[in-house]
Regions:
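Extracellular/secretory-pathway and virion-surface proteins
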Residues: 1-206
Length: 206
């Protein structure tokens, strides 16, 4: 299913739809998501903007971000055979049966992009029989909604405690950080930090 995401009268930056995905996960080793962007008849939007794909957890109705990307400048993703590839195996428990997906592109023009999303369920020996996801923090409604570099962070609760059950065999932390926003401090050449900076740390205490 291809969706035109754009900004203006009668247009929308987001789309929510339900899909019937693979049912039996017993022999699924990994899941790959492919995000393809094509140019509308008027051409693609000229700017690189924040975009993501989310899946709804059916019990809590919470949205979990399964992939984030930055759109290319004024072109599509045809240089990539199937589009932008994202490994979404961590979200195996949410990508089975009938699922609700949300796509968002923070585009400010009526041109926008034609978006399609595809999944590959790769058969093999799963590393674990069961998967579980716990949200630590999520600030991804738009490009400026998150923790901005160099600015006051007192309004954010950045200390989180996670409890693990006795039957947990392995856990890992998944972070998606795009560094958007042109925030301070500037570098030695006077340029403000944006997606070009790699300034983040994660401290874990047992």
């Amino acid at each position: 299913v291809e969706e035109h995401l754009a900004f203006g009268s009668g247009l929308s930056q987001s789309s929510v739809k339900s899909f019937d995905l693979h049912n039996n996960m017993e022999n699924i080793e990994s899941i790959k998501m492919y995000v393809k962007l094509e140019c509308p008849n008027a051409g693609c939007n000229a700017w690189d903007v924040f975009a993501n794909i989310l899946v709804k957890e059916p019990v809590s109705n919470e949205w979990f971000e399964i992939g984030r990307y930055i759109t290319p400048y004024g072109v599509d993703t045809s240089a990539l055979e199937r589009g932008i590839e994202i490994d979404v195996t961590d979200f195996k428990s949410l990508l089975s049966g009938t699922v609700e997906l949300k796509a968002y592109i923070e585009v400010w023009g009526s041109d926008g992009w034609n978006l399609s999303v595809d999944f590959d369920y790769v058969e093999g020996e799963p590393d674990y029989k069961y998967y579980q996801i716990s949200r630590v923090m999520q600030h991804n409604k738009n490009s400026l909604e998150g923790v901005i570099y160099g600015e006051d962070q007192s309004k954010f609760d950045l200390d989180k405690t996670i409890s693990f059950g006795e039957n947990i065999q392995k856990a890992h932390l998944r972070t998606i950080i795009t560094g958007w926003g042109h925030a301070t401090p500037a570098d030695s050449d006077g340029r403000r930090c944006a997606e070009w900076c790699c300034w983040h740390t994660v401290s874990m205490l047992k």
